C-alpha cells in the first residue's frame, strides 16, 4: 500500500507540533513548509522530529522545505501559515492580513496537489476557509476548516474538570463560528448518557460555556506571546485520521453551507461526517429555538468578517 503524504504549510508551533503527532502515529509521511527566510527553522524542526523516531519507533519520513514542489501529490494539505494572534487582537483583526496569505498558499497547493483535501487553521478561520475554497476552485467537500473539534475539546475538558470525571465520558458538540459567538449545544451534552443539566446547575453551565468561548483568548493572555498549539494540532490530527482512514467520524467542522441550518454561501462550524471524500455529508440536528437563534447570531458574525474579504 502506498504511504500517505501530508503537507503542512507553516512551521510555527502548531504546524511543527502537528508534524510530530502525525509522524509519531505513522499516519503518513510529512512535508513541513515555510517561507524562504525561515529555511533553517523549518529544516531544523523536521530534523529534530526525525531524530526522535528511534525513541518512539516510527518510520514516517519528515521533510522540512521552502519549496512547494516537495508537497506534490499530497493527500491532505494543512494550512497553518499566517499572522499570529496577539494579546488584545480579535480574530477579525487578522482578516485583511491573512487573506493574501491564503490566496498565495492555495495557488501553490492547487498547482502541486490538485486532488488533495485542504484543512484550514489560519484565523479568522471561518472566513479563511471560505477564502481558500474560492481560491482553490475545489468542490466544497475537499476544503474543511478546523474549529469545532478544538472548541468541543475545550468544552469537554472544562466539564470533566468541573465534575472531576474522566474526559472519556463527556459527550458534547460546539457549533458556529470560531470566536465569541460559538454555540455549545448544552441540551444534548451528557456524561456517559447523563444530561449535563442533572450534574451542574445553570450558573456552572453558563460559566463553562463562557470559558469555552474565551478558550483561545485565555491561552493567548497566559502565554503573553503567541497562541495555543498543542490542542489545535491534536484537533487537526483527529480530522486527518478520520479522512485518511475513512472512519466516517461525526466531527464538527467548518463547511460551506448551501441551505443547511437556514444559511447559504457561508463557511460555518456544523456537524460533519469526515471520510476519505473529505466532508461526506453535513448532519442537520434538530436545534432548540434558543440554539438556532444563537447559531444565527454566530453566522451573522462570521458573515460580517467575510464581507471584509477582498475576493468573495
Swiss-Prot record:
Cross-referenced InterPro entries: L-lactate/malate_DH (IPR001557), Lactate/malate_DH_C (IPR022383), Lactate/malate_DH_N (IPR001236), Lactate_DH/Glyco_Ohase_4_C (IPR015955), Malate_DH_type3 (IPR011275), NAD(P)-bd_dom_sf (IPR036291)
GO biological process, one term: tricarboxylic acid cycle
Molecular function per GO: L-lactate dehydrogenase activity; L-malate dehydrogenase (NAD+) activity
Residue positions binding NAD(+): 10-15, 34, 98, 121-123
Active site location: 178 (proton acceptor)
List of residues binding substrate: 85, 91, 123, 154
Reaction catalysed by this enzyme: (S)-malate + NAD(+) = oxaloacetate + NADH + H(+)
Keywords annotated in UniProt: NAD, Oxidoreductase, Tricarboxylic acid cycle
Keyword S-adenosyl-L-methionine attributed: no
Top-level class of the enzyme under EC nomenclature: oxidoreductase
Enzyme Commission designation: 1.1.1.37
HAMAP family listed in its UniProt record: Malate_dehydrog_3
Family: Belongs to the LDH/MDH superfamily. MDH type 3 family.
Family matches, as PANTHER family: L-2-HYDROXYCARBOXYLATE DEHYDROGENASE (NAD(P)(+)) (PTHR43128), L-LACTATE DEHYDROGENASE (PTHR43128:SF16)
Role: Catalyzes the reversible oxidation of malate to oxaloacetate.
Name of the molecule in the record: Malate dehydrogenase
UniProt organism field: Staphylococcus saprophyticus subsp. saprophyticus (strain ATCC 15305 / DSM 20229 / NCIMB 8711 / NCTC 7292 / S-41)
Name of the encoding gene: mdh
Amino acid at each position: 500500500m502506498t504511504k500517505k503524504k501530508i503537507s503542512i504549510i507553516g512551521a510555527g508551533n502548531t504546524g511543527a507540533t502537528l508534524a510530530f503527532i502525525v509522524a509519531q502515529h505513522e499516519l503518513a509521511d510529512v512535508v513541513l513548509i515555510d517561507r524562504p527566510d525561515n529555511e533553517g527553522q523549518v529544516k531544523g524542526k523536521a530534523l529534530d522530529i526525525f531524530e526522535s523516531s528511534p525513541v518512539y519507533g516510527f518510520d514516517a519520513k519528515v521533510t522540512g522545505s521552502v519549496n512547494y514542489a516537495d508537497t506534490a501529490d499530497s493527500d491532505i494539505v494543512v494550512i497553518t501559515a499566517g499572522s499570529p494572534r496577539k494579546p488584545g487582537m480579535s480574530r477579525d483583526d487578522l482578516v485583511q492580513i491573512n487573506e493574501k496569505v491564503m490566496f498565495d498558499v492555495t495557488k501553490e497547493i492547487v498547482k502541486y496537489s490538485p486532488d488533495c483535501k485542504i484543512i484550514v487553521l489560519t484565523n479568522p478561520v471561518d472566513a479563511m476557509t471560505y477564502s481558500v475554497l474560492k481560491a482553490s476552485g475545489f468542490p466544497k467537500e475537499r476544503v474543511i476548516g478546523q474549529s469545532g473539534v478544538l472548541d468541543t475539546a475545550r468544552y469537554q475538558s472544562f466539564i470533566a474538570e468541573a465534575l472531576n470525571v474522566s474526559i472519556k465520558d463527556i459527550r458534547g458538540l460546539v457549533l458556529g463560528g470560531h470566536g465569541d459567538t460559538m454555540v455549545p449545544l448544552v441540551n444534548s451534552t451528557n456524561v456517559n448518557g447523563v444530561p449535563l443539566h442533572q450534574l451542574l446547575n445553570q450558573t456552572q453551565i453558563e460559566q463553562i460555556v463562557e470559558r469555552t468561548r474565551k478558550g483561545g483568548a485565555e491561552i493567548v493572555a497566559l502565554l503573553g506571546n503567541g497562541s495555543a498549539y498543542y490542542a489545535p494540532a491534536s484537533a487537526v490530527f483527529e480530522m486527518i485520521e478520520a479522512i485518511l482512514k475513512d472512519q466516517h467520524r461525526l466531527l464538527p467542522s467548518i463547511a460551506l453551507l448551501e441551505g443547511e441550518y437556514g444559511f447559504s454561501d457561508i463557511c460555518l462550524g456544523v456537524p460533519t461526517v469526515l471520510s476519505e471524500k473529505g466532508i461526506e455529508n453535513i448532519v442537520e440536528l434538530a436545534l432548540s429555538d434558543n440554539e438556532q437563534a444563537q447559531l444565527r447570531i454566530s453566522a451573522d458574525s462570521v458573515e460580517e468578517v467575510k464581507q471584509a474579504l477582498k475576493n468573495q
